[in-house]
């Protein structure tokens, strides 16, 4: 073909004539000339001949690394964490396994591949490792080391040469938990707490001889189903937890807040749930001295009367809206009695400055305003600067303890503020990997039992974190609790608990010297 018929192209197969292949117009020179272009993965794998480096080599002229400065911090060791877990969990196995082995529901263990203990420990270990859902518990459950770990914890015999060794799936655990009596399973949690009490774990967390129990309600989980109303979808529970100065909130008892009754058109409430919970708590611990700590919802005469009837003390948040008449009388009595003390703090120059005020009044002194007295004391705490007890805060507390001087008033205020430990616990369980508010199943019994096993795992984790991980974290203080849980999960997947016999691990010494009020 003649060149004029080819659009002045010398090559009939060329994409663009040389006339247009300049000045930035037209196609790229590589494409116009039939050259291969470097795009995507090819650009990464092949050297572009059109790019030249001033200095060839992989160092690009950088100087050789030479360490200087202070040595880096130690990294957490997953094998050491597994060894510590082995020594920690053994005494708790001896407490839990005899109690759980008889809770078999309607199944026959001899006809099943997994024993009831194996199913319990499958769920407890999943919660302990912060695997917040059934999908995460199923993710890597069939690895050999993980399966051996679950069987080691439950004590179920197994063949070490079995090539088909695996762990039960979450659906098997769910079907089993749907048949177990939740009341009987809750007694296992109670026995675990009794073991901690007998072991003197709360010796330094007692207020005038009383173990402090905070009560509060929380959303447990949400049921699925388009046929359910918004009120029926939510499962609420009232929790009673032992709180300590070092941040523990150990689950003790829980009482379900009944779902909305459409026939009676009535909704259960925390107050009615507390009446039921207090009755069970007194039956389970008839001689134990407790101090009930609650928010303003519980600051009313019926709750105080229940505490007095059970020989319990109380510290309740006192607000104007709960007992308006008494609140106004207390304010007048404070002006008349003038029982108060200034709180001080050191300023940057080394001097002393006022940082707050604490006052107290016996509600019996309100008889002048009310005509009759109230059998409790009121402590008011107000700080506008940093003090030994924390930063700025304003609060008022009603208590059954005698308050006659500043130190007792400050102590009452400090324990009243520790009610927030239970709120912190709820937040950790919701967002820290335990799965509170996550829907594990729609069955009421199984959901209740999942919640109880979560509380057992959360109790064990708090003791493990404070008594064991605090030792391991001395040189790697930036490792969070959730990261330790992941490291333990990795160690169990790779090594397994069978790689650390209890005889060689020994009993892990607990660190207790910092558990001081």
Which stretches of residues belong to each language-model region?
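Gly/serine-rich nucleotide phosphate-binding loop at the start of the catalytic core
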Residues: 4, 26-161, 497-509
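Charge-dense polyanion-binding interfaces
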Residues: 193-201, 205, 325-326, 331, ...
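Conserved, well-structured functional cores that handle cations and Mg-NTP chemistry
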Residues: 94-98, 107-316, 480
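Polybasic, low-complexity terminal segments and linkers that are predominantly intrinsically disordered
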Residues: 1-31
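Intrinsically disordered or highly flexible coil/loop and linker segments, enriched in small
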Residues: 131-132, 421-426, 462-469
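A C-terminal functional module that forms or caps the active site or interfaces directly
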Residues: 397-403, 409-454
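An anionic, glycine-rich sequence signature occurring as long contiguous blocks
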Residues: 313-421
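A short, flexible helix-boundary coil/loop motif
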Residues: 3-4, 9, 29, 80-83, ...
